[in-house]
Amino acid sequence: MGDQSIISALLLGIIEGLTEFIPVSSTAHVLLAGHFLGFKSPGNTFAVLIQLGAILAILLVYFQKLVSIAVAMPTSAKARRFVLAVLVAFLPAAVIGALAHDFIKTVLFETPMLICVVLIIGGFILLAVDRMPLKPKYTDIMDYPPSLAFKIGLFQCLAMIPGTSRSGATIVGALLMGTDKRSAAEFSFFLAMPTMLGAFVLDLYKNRDALSFDDSALIAVGFVAAFVSGLFVVRSLLDFVSRRGFAPFAWWRIVIGALGLVALLVIG
């Protein structure tokens, strides 16, 4: 294990944390960065465990709100409806993810060119939706009905295609269904909790025979980097979106996708 491997692990962890909760596709960024850095994950352990760092970041930021919702559930119909809405939104991705896991991981994830193209297409879609004169009917995530949440959950299934972005798909779906930008991003945070935990557990189970902690230092570096950078994003994203919208992320996707295509054609 050399200094170059540690630097690569640090960069990939930072990329995971910074991109996991914004609509630019963390999967695309981590896969493309790993490809061009020539980083070889120890088994599949590194890729699986750095996700846990990002998961813990969002759980920490929203810990008090999660506790308050849990405490209110026995007496508050609003709290119970919100929990139901999150679970209903999670269901489509849970079913499709479990059924198509092997195909997604072994076929779609091995196609960098596809990832770049999807990044660009998704960027233009996000840009178009961000500029639409939408009139939001829902501005508080606690008021999202389960029927709305289910539709958002269907959009989340699009994120099975690498480069789409889980948060991007849910945010676009929420905006088209009548939410405002801030609450769309916040609901995406809450939906990320069961979705990412479920994906983590499934990945861990599927890769149980390949897991290796031989390079535990690399895993630790990536994990901590993902956790710290994830904290920064979760704490600042809602205010950023309220001020700037999603256009900066859309242009970022387009630029990174285009640069990735050029690099793949030139370098391979």
Swiss-Prot record:
This is Undecaprenyl-diphosphatase 1. Its EC number is 3.6.1.27. One of its GO terms (cellular component) is plasma membrane. One of its GO terms (molecular function) is undecaprenyl-diphosphatase activity. Its main location: membrane. GO terms for biological process: cell wall organization; peptidoglycan biosynthetic process; regulation of cell shape; response to antibiotic. Belongs to the UppP family. It comes from Agrobacterium fabrum (strain C58 / ATCC 33970). Catalyzes the dephosphorylation of undecaprenyl diphosphate (UPP). Confers resistance to bacitracin. InterPro entries: UppP. Bacitracin is thought to be involved in the inhibition of peptidoglycan synthesis by sequestering undecaprenyl diphosphate, thereby reducing the pool of lipid carrier available. It is a multi-pass membrane protein. It catalyses: di-trans,octa-cis-undecaprenyl diphosphate + H2O = di-trans,octa-cis-undecaprenyl phosphate + phosphate + H(+). It is found in: Cell inner membrane. It comes from the Bacteria. Keywords: Antibiotic resistance, Cell inner membrane, Cell membrane, Cell shape, Cell wall biogenesis/degradation, Hydrolase, Membrane, Peptidoglycan synthesis, Transmembrane, Transmembrane helix.
